[in-house]
Amino acid sequence: YFTGLRLGEVAGLTWQDINLEEQYLIVRRSVRYNGARHKTEIGPTKRKKVRVVDFGDTLAGILKTAKKEQRKQRFQYGQLYHRNYYKEVREKNRVHYEYYNLDGTQEIPMDYTEIFFVCLRSDGCLELPSTVETACRSASRKVPQLEGFHFHTLRHTYTTNLLSNGAQ
């Protein structure tokens, strides 16, 4: 709602992408499920462009709280807290990045690189776009005022608010 990002772009945000002091974020990647490979992948945004998005005090506060909460949960879960990784895969002149999560009891393969996502469940696993879509559908069915709601509605609301405030 505060940034107009697509769902996969929100899932792909890392703490390295966010500047809380200057209140902007850099959209570099997107997370999506590849049905052909039966894998969650980290890849470029829809238009394959990196962009900078400013945000205000409200979102800055939400993000600061989320970061503190993640630290607390990492401590509480201990070795059972999941860490997120990606692995570069090259096939047929194409490079893509597969997503994996492992808890502290599992050995980390040498070709895995840790990535620090913003949108995590309490156990440290990435909050997948499919889970958010399911929650939106459920809310849409259960709450009459949200009939027809889906995550992309937030992107439209963001754009409408920008235009009504004079953006071009």
Kindly give the residue locations of the regions a language model identified.
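Short, basic (Lys/Arg/His-rich) helix/loop patches that form interaction surfaces
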Residues: T3, V53, R71-Q76, V95-Q168
